[in-house]
Amino acid sequence: MNKALKALGVLTTFVMLVVLIGGALVTKTGSGLGCGRQWPLCHGRFFPELNAASIIEWSHRLASGVSIVLVLSLAFWAWRKVTPVFRETTFLAIMSIIFLFLQALLGALAVVFGSNALVMALHFGISLISFASVLILTLLIFEADKSDKKLVKPLRIGRKMQFHMIGLSIYTYIVVYTGAYVRHTKSSLACPDVPLCSRLNHGLPSHFQEWVQMGHRTAALLLFVWILVAFAHAVRSYKDQKQILGGWIAALAFVVLQALSGIMVVYSEMATGFALAHSLFIAGLFGVLCYFLLLIARFRYESKQRNI
């Protein structure tokens, strides 16, 4: 496969991650209106004023603009080169473009017209899908060489494993939404203790922001347990399937790091590094789970072809 295409895929994935983390930084620092209610200009100018909020918001917009050019280039090039090897390339190319523009549109509308926490939480979720689409498209580009050399072992995914993969992909997105809602309702520090909310009221939440925070923690705990169960199933039954076993090892690592960074967000009183790491690890986890969905689609197609 063309080395330049691989390089473009890696660069585009990195820039999409920068956009995702940049959006989290905008929320963390309250810089959403750093350029006022104007888009794409910043207080009527192309270059921002020299203050932190304006620079953070403008940099996020700049990265988003660069990502549009890169994603369009990658999608078209991958569609031309990789589709003959992997039929799912077309779908991923379209997905990456649609969700990228949807993400940009929501961000622009939020700046110009304002928005509420529910919609802004959705903005992060759409950004996550956009990133995952580009990540998987890049993985396909690298896998195309292995496929040509027939190094990819035929997939075997049972119904139980498919249930874990599909169910966790959907449920993780829900947990992501609750986490984004925590940030946009300013509930990140509503509960100063872990695992209970506080030392008052028997550790139970007593007002809206505490309920939002504890709801997210409960959902995240269930996510951790579910991934642990799926990982154990993979270890028992899929040792010969490196893509699946390796994926679950990565998923478990990401969810552990996600939990630890979430705890440190509370104890560090939302230190920027831990807050951004929290977004980074969930992006990695969601990317792995979306790759599992690709494997399921590929397995079902191959099974159908064998039965014809």
UniProtKB/Swiss-Prot annotation:
Residues 1-6, 87-92, 143-161, 236-243, 297-308 are cytoplasmic. Catalyzes the conversion of heme O to heme A by two successive hydroxylations of the methyl group at C8. The first hydroxylation forms heme I, the second hydroxylation results in an unstable dihydroxymethyl group, which spontaneously dehydrates, resulting in the formyl group of heme A. GO terms for biological process: heme A biosynthetic process. It comes from the Bacteria. It is found in: Cell membrane. Keywords: Cell membrane, Disulfide bond, Heme biosynthesis, Iron, Membrane, Metal-binding, Oxidoreductase, Transmembrane, Transmembrane helix. Residues 28-65, 114-121, 183-214, 265-275 are extracellular. The chain crosses the membrane at residues 7-27, 66-86, 93-113, 122-142, 162-182, 215-235, 244-264, 276-296. Its cofactor is heme b. The active site is at 57. Heme o binds at residues 60, 123. The N-half (TM1-TM4) and C-half (TM5-TM8) domains are connected by an intracellular loop. Each domain is formed from four-helix bundles and they align in a pseudo twofold symmetry manner. The N-half domain is the substrate-heme O binding domain and the C-half domain is the cofactor heme B binding domain. The lineage of its organism: Bacteria, Bacillati, Bacillota, Bacilli, Bacillales. It is a multi-pass membrane protein. It catalyses: Fe(II)-heme o + 2 A + H2O = Fe(II)-heme a + 2 AH2. Heme b binds at residues 216, 278. Pfam families: COX15-CtaA. Interacts with CtaB. GO terms for cellular component: plasma membrane. Disulfide bonds join 35-42, 191-197. Pathway: Porphyrin-containing compound metabolism; heme A biosynthesis; heme A from heme O: step 1/1. Belongs to the COX15/CtaA family. Type 1 subfamily. This is Heme A synthase. Its main location: membrane. One of its GO terms (molecular function) is oxidoreductase activity, acting on NAD(P)H, heme protein as acceptor. Its EC number is 1.17.99.9.
